Amino acid sequence: MNSRLLALAVAVTLPVLNPSLVLSADTKEKAAAVSEEDGKFFDAEGTPTFKIENGTVDWYTFSGYRRYHSDCHVCHGPDGVGSSYAPALAESMKNMDYPTFLSIVAEGRQNVGGGKENVMPAFGDNKNVYCYLDDIYIYLRARAVDAAPRGRPPNKADKPQGAKDYEASCMGG
């Protein structure tokens, strides 16, 4: 059996043998904040998430909105709705886990198929993106599970000291 067929057989068989390897779609329930550390919220699995109450978003969701619209919306469309040459992240994030998101943004990705080529550039060296990966992830996760509507969040929590300290450290300030 050649290596390509073997890889395909493994990819098809592993989820059958171990159903936990199949990533199920994210939902508001899975994304619910169960813990908080200096203004950053986490779900039951310890993955960064959002907290939106009475129309007020946590700082990281708001920051993610700002950072997304600074660097990502040019290709992926406003509010993650996609464009003619980049996928709708508000849709694809429903089935993308946190490590995969971090890897794709940091390292980039190239998809070629059906006569079409899509290239996601690597942003691992761009501090304006890399220093805010959690924020962008949190914002897109909120959009993916319909917790955050389109447009600028009307109200936001204050910027926590932990966010200020991390930003200064990451940006070199």
Identify the role of each PLM range.
Residues G80-E107, V119-N126:
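Gly/Gly-Pro-rich "capping" loops immediately C-terminal to redox-active cysteine motifs
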Residues W59, S63, R67, S84, ...:
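Extracytoplasmic/secreted proteins, especially bacterial periplasmic and envelope-associated proteins
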Residues M1-L8:
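Bacterial N-terminal signal peptides that target proteins for export
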Residues F41, V57-P78, S103-E107, G162, ...:
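Sequence/structural segment immediately N-terminal to covalent heme-attachment motifs in c-type
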Residues K28-F50, D58, G115-G173:
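Flexible coil segments in periplasmic/lumen-exposed cytochrome c-class electron-transfer proteins
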Residues H69, H73, G77, K94, ...:
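Sec-exported extracytoplasmic/periplasmic mature domains
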Residues V22-T27:
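Boundary at the C-terminal end of the N-terminal hydrophobic targeting segment
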